[in-house]
UniProtKB/Swiss-Prot annotation:
One of its GO terms (molecular function) is mRNA binding. Keywords: Chloroplast, Plastid, Ribonucleoprotein, Ribosomal protein, RNA-binding, rRNA-binding, Transit peptide. It comes from Arabidopsis thaliana. GO terms for cellular component: chloroplast; chloroplast envelope; chloroplast stroma; plastid; ribonucleoprotein complex; ribosome. This is Large ribosomal subunit protein uL24c. One of its GO terms (biological process) is plastid translation. HAMAP family: Ribosomal_uL24_B (MF_01326_B).
Length: 198
């Protein structure tokens, strides 16, 4: 009962009339009016950083498909790495990722991957795989002249559009080269299919 009477007396001391209402106003204690507060208000709010998901890191079109970048290299080109850990290495482009402008070069940018065993008796493995490298870190390479060059585009007399090396004038895109690349790729896929079937 004593606590109830104390509460009632405290409510009666508070007079909430329309003239003395504090709704919508800042509550300031009478002590803070006379004495400046030693605590400074936060001027810069703290930044909240969030890690983006893999599909959110890609730039997308309005239809949610990723924006595909144009690259100066294509599948089967011989390139030389001009910057990074593998600077100076020469290899052939084996895979292209146009959504983030990266390429995979044979025997370049090797990473170690620890593979778990799939079956109970099979041991785990440590394998070396070729990781992607950004296409801006490579330049097209001429095996004949041992020189790197930028790529140019021109139309031949028969109306065929081709790429060529600006320094040497050597044609990169030829029909014979594409036929050889296609045959090699088909042969590789049939070998993989045969080994997986057996």
């Amino acid at each position: 009962m004593a606590t109830m009477s104390a509460l009632q007396s405290s409510f009666t001391s508070l007079s909430l009339s329309p003239s003395s209402s504090f709704l919508g106003q800042r509550l300031i204690s009478p002590i803070s009016l006379s004495v400046t507060s030693p605590v400074k208000p936060a001027e810069n709010p703290c930044l909240v950083l969030a890690k983006l998901k893999r599909w959110e890191r890609k730039e997308c079109k309005p239809n949610s498909l990723p924006i595909l970048h144009k690259m100066h290299v294509k599948f089967g080109d011989t390139v030389k790495v001009i910057s990074g850990r593998d600077k100076g290495k020469i290899g052939e482009v084996t895979k292209i990722f146009t959504h983030n402008s990266t390429i995979v070069i044979k025997d370049v940018n090797l990473k170690t991957k620890h593979m778990k065993s799939r079956e109970e008796g099979e041991p785990g493995q440590i394998v070396k795989i070729e990781a992607p490298i950004h296409s801006s870190n490579v330049m097209l390479y001429s095996k004949e002249k041992d020189v790197v060059s930028r790529v140019g585009h021109k139309v031949l007399e028969d109306g065929q559009k081709v790429r060529y090396l600006i320094k040497t004038g050597e044609l990169i895109d030829t029909i014979e080269k594409w036929k050889l690349l296609k045959e090699a790729k088909d042969k590789e896929t049939t070998q993989v299919a045969v080994t997986s079937a057996s």
